Amino acid sequence: MALRSPQYIFGDFSPDEFNQFFVTPRASVELPPYGGTVLCGAQAADDLPDGHDYQRIEFGVNEVIEPSDTLPRTPNYSISSTLNPQAPEFILSCTTSKKLPDDIDKEVNYSSANCQYPGPALALDGGSPAEAEALENDGVSGGLGQRERKKKKKRPPGYYSYLKDGGEGGPSAEALVNGHAGPAVSNSVGAEDTDLMGDVPTAGTPRTWGSPQDATDFVSDAGPAGAFPGALDGGARTAGQLEGCPGADSEASCLPAEAGRDTLLRTAVAQPSVGTDTTENLGVTNGQILESLGEGTAANGVELHTVESSDSDPAKAESAPPPADAPASAAGTVPASQPAKSWASLFHDSKPSSSSLPVVSVETKYSPPATSPLVSEKQAEVKEGLVPVSEDPVAIKIAELLENVTLIHKPVSLQPRGLINKGNWCYINATLQALVACPPMYHLMKLIPLYSKVQRPCTSTPMIDSFVRLMNEFTNMPVPPKPRQALGDKIVRDIRPGAAFEPTYIYRLLTVIKSSLSEKGRQEDAEEYLGFILNGLHEEMLNLKKLLSPNNDKLTISNGPKSHSVNEDEQEEPGEGSEDEWEQVGPRNKTSVTRQADFVQTPITGIFGGHIRSVVYQQSSKESATLQPFFTLQLDIQSDKIRTVQDALESLVARESVQGYTTKTRQEVEISRRVTLEKLPPVLVLHLKRFVYEKTGGCQKLIKNIEYPVDLEISKELLSPGVKNKNFKCHRTYRLFAVVYHHGSSATGGHYTTDVFQIGLNGWLRIDDQTVKVVSQQQVVRPAAERTAYLLYYRRVDLL
């Protein structure tokens, strides 16, 4: 007895018929009883998901691939074994049965990314499930039903329903998927259907014949493999398959077709879940990120603009309006007057024609993002917010506070924080870390209230405001853990630095106050920046003092000379002579005259301000002395004899001869000059002058090791004669608390880092921009080839 097995008979087709009906990668012929979709074409098996094996039959070849009996039969696949491409309903433009809106939820419509052809709907699986089940049972059993069916002309499921129910007014189809047409849907979709609109994954879908291979033509290849969890979950499905939405993990809902909407964009590129807080990424095309525009259209001429925000709200993205240059018909319905196309014409070329819906190829013209106006706007806000102290209502409060302030030198244990350097700001970051480690500077800024933009929209003290904000970035450090014993006798201390931040408000001060440091091409110098800070804070505090004493002439910001004589009988008229020229004392044997520049005290001068006395000795004349203020003490280290900081200090006060000086009578005289320390500040900053300017205009760096102690004692010989016996040893002894290093051998480049003493750790920290690590005291004072000490910060020990 012959074994009754399913037989599949295919007719002889001419080459033209074969090319029309069977040459397409997206066409699928589903054969019973195996239920596996047979994909045709060279690209069919390339993009299948893992774990799925599909039977492949190639037409027009001599060898027939025998099917495997182990292919499972699942009800998830609909069977269409009576496909006859020569049926008249597939060649002529027949209409489908009219669907009601209630049928939307029963069927799944897929908008093919490469088969968007308007025209009559072509439903290949319009038959009822009962009819399909009967056909499947007949095919399996091979009984009488199958023999009777062989005698009949093969008709597709639902063929007679076309003749019975087909009529005018049938909706036009949107697309064919795998050679099948989905149910037509009215253009008006309710709110419930809109909420159900989701994504149709295509990561594992075979590419259509003639579809663009490059990702720049379309974004279907942009996502990584496995990026779309719903891609081909259970293998290939026909358009008429009834299947629920993907699982909760993918959070994608079934997508009903809606003409004229952005369904193609959603089909080609799967969107992430709605619950994310980050920007929705659709894919990368030519290095740009195409962002989801929610309900935006994908019509012709609509561009996908790059959205730069990384914390955009998805709800805002859904409500974003379409671009202004989008045509009005983009979000409307499909034009009704479309040329009718035959079923066979769909397989000639999947590239859209000029008359087809312009949703296959989305124009992604790259528009470079505009320069972020964040910095410029903030900078403009600060400039516009600058007002005179007389127009600043908060200025009088700060002035009264600074007038009665008492400097606090008590050490404070702050949690260290690195400073992010996104530009060439290392010389600023290094200086800021040293100032934060200065206790009186920290306490002074913490005494001034921190005002918000709402509380103080206009300011007359931008530098004070910025440093008050900087000091408030640092908080008290938690109690440090006990030192733990490491290998050997070394003590290892742990440090927990806070999060690094970028002090952009400090950087903007360079342009707001129009400092010369902001000029392009200038050497970035940490000592010059320190002077810029201290002088700027000092001048703002002087302006605040004017509010309390508006008629006080001494508060003028001037370095003009003021004559002061020890012997009032010999006092000269004020304003006679100039501070810049040598003043010759009268021939009578009287006490020398000391000339002093106006230097009004502020809290900044109370911390960093000192005085040096410059005395000029002239033959046959008495001494002429001038008092000059300083914030940093300049130490010349160019001589080969200078190896330590003490050597540089002694060289500073050494008597030097001045050649070529002439009097008013054009007579050359021999003079000499000596500098001594008149007043020592609580915080002494020593500047090792490593950058030497040549006569040709160039600049070179002195790379030599200068030894500096942790405890520095200022010798009595360095002091002025009038203050030698007034300063006790405790007033002349300092302790190192910060070192600013310069790295590199070039005077016009390099890098800056800082070592600071941490009182809570009772040790040293090395801060390189945002990097913070613990170092030993020996590492701080030990010379190194890669770095040289540039600024030394000392505190008086009697104030510790």
UniProtKB/Swiss-Prot annotation:
One of its GO terms (molecular function) is transmembrane transporter binding. InterPro entries: PAM2_motif, Papain-like_cys_pep_sf, Peptidase_C19, Peptidase_C19_UCH, USP_CS, USP_dom. The modification Phosphothreonine is found at T24. GO terms for cellular component: cytoplasm; early endosome; nucleus; protein-containing complex. The modification N-acetylalanine is found at A2. It is an enzyme of class 3 (hydrolase). Residues 2-100 are annotated as: Interaction with p53/TP53. Found in a deubiquitination complex with TANK, USP10 and ZC3H12A; this complex inhibits genotoxic stress- or interleukin-1-beta (IL1B)-mediated NF-kappa-B activation by promoting IKBKG or TRAF6 deubiquitination. Interacts with IKBKG; this interaction increases in response to DNA damage. Interacts with TANK; this interaction increases in response to DNA damage. Interacts with TRAF6; this interaction increases in response to DNA damage. Interacts with ZC3H12A; this interaction increases in response to DNA damage. This is Ubiquitin carboxyl-terminal hydrolase 10.
